[in-house]
Amino acid sequence: MSFASSPRLFWNFTSTFVASRTFPRHRIWLRNIAQPFSTAKTTPNLLSQMEKHAHPAQFPPVQSLSPRIPSMSPHFNEADRIEKYLHEDGHRAWGFVIYRCTYESDTAWEEFMRRILANTEETLEGSGGLDLLDNLAVTVFQDSSFDGATAAVVRDHFKRWAATAAQQEQGTGPGFSERYLYCIQVTQDVLDSVLADHDGFVRLVRGDWKEYDPYEEGERVEEEHEALEGCTLENVGWMQVPFDGVMVIPWYFLRGYGWEREYRRPPTVACF
């Protein structure tokens, strides 16, 4: 059964809003970037829901810190670590922004979204963290202008969005939140890998990456690699990460200087 036809989910393409019945704590908004919420063609009820979830600061406060699984150290518990970082940043909402960059099949896209939501719930359940679904904000940018877009195009849009999003969503600055540092890019090869195998991969794009000079005093200090989207540097500003647990595991592994530690140049898939 497709994501769109599933009786447990409601997907309204006209309003570009998804309300999940499978995951009642989820509220997902899919926004056409050229159209503000105030002008979206939708019913008053759906518009009200969209406006509500465009401001995650209205989400419930994160619960007080407490180990969910007594037999496991909070340091090794994914949910405990996400909760800890939310407290540190003074935030309520978490979750990577997703960019849809392939439009060959809506059915395939719907299945991808179904899988990423199911996988996120399953990952959190394993660490006793289903309560964090209350604070999960999944923002998807989908517009035909992103069809076939490079990581550089996605990064440019993401940086402009992130510049003001934290204040609008959280009512405070971005802190060290991964939500405003990284985003997920779904290209056709990403989609194919996920639908062909649950061990597929997605692209994770670093928002603040800048091209750097590989030369020092006239000598190249790193190997010149095969060009990826025109870049021959070792660090191209994006990497491929496992689909399994993608909303949860990179969230805490990339905290601080995690990118420098975990980065692998594509096509190698990073292993968290």
Show which residues each predicted segment covers.
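Extended, charge-biased low-complexity segments
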Residues: 6-234
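Acidic, proline/glycine-rich low-complexity IDRs
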Residues: 216-272
